[in-house]
């Protein structure tokens, strides 16, 4: 191991840079994998809106027509915005709320017993989308996103 001060001082920053690269890569993979699926689910709901309206009516959800449109649009447009990394955190807010409500409506027992029966909580169909939305909401889209590209462009212009 080198004790050269230049090497020692450079190592933490290069390790941190590698960590940021890995973080951004993981965020990109999460965005593409989960939110492309969510986009397709939302698009299918928009193409056949009668199905979610009927499902929401059967569940006793108030204003099933309005809620079906809101959920379908949130999943479709929120999903594609998050995949692109455009207005990512803003898009993640309604997606997170929608997944939380879906979780509660589909299986409130799993939500209430998260500590007693965590296997039931994490095996619910809503869990991966809810977790992915929380991750993107908390950590942002990473370097590989339109948000990051626009951020770099605007910073560069403001420095000129």
Model regions and ranges:
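Short juxtamembrane and helix-loop transition motifs at transmembrane-helix boundaries
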Residues: 49-62, 89
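Extended, low-polarity transmembrane helix blocks
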Residues: 1-47, 65-73, 77-80, 84-160
């Amino acid at each position: 191991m080198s004790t050269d001060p230049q090497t020692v001082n450079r190592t933490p920053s290069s390790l941190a840079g590698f960590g940021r690269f890995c973080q951004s890569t993981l965020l990109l993979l999460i965005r593409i994998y989960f939110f492309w699926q969510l986009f397709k689910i939302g698009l299918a709901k928009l193409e056949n809106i009668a199905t979610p309206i009927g499902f929401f009516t059967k569940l006793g959800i108030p204003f099933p027509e309005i809620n079906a449109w809101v959920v379908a649009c949130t999943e479709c447009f929120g999903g594609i915005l998050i995949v692109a990394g455009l207005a990512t955190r803003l898009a993640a807010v309604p997606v997170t709320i929608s997944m939380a409500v879906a979780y509660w409506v589909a299986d409130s027992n799993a939500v209430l017993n998260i500590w007693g029966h965590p296997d039931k909580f994490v095996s619910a169909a809503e869990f991966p989308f809810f977790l992915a939305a929380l991750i993107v909401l908390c950590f942002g889209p990473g370097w590989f996103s339109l948000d990051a590209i626009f951020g770099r462009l605007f910073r560069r212009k403001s420095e000129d």
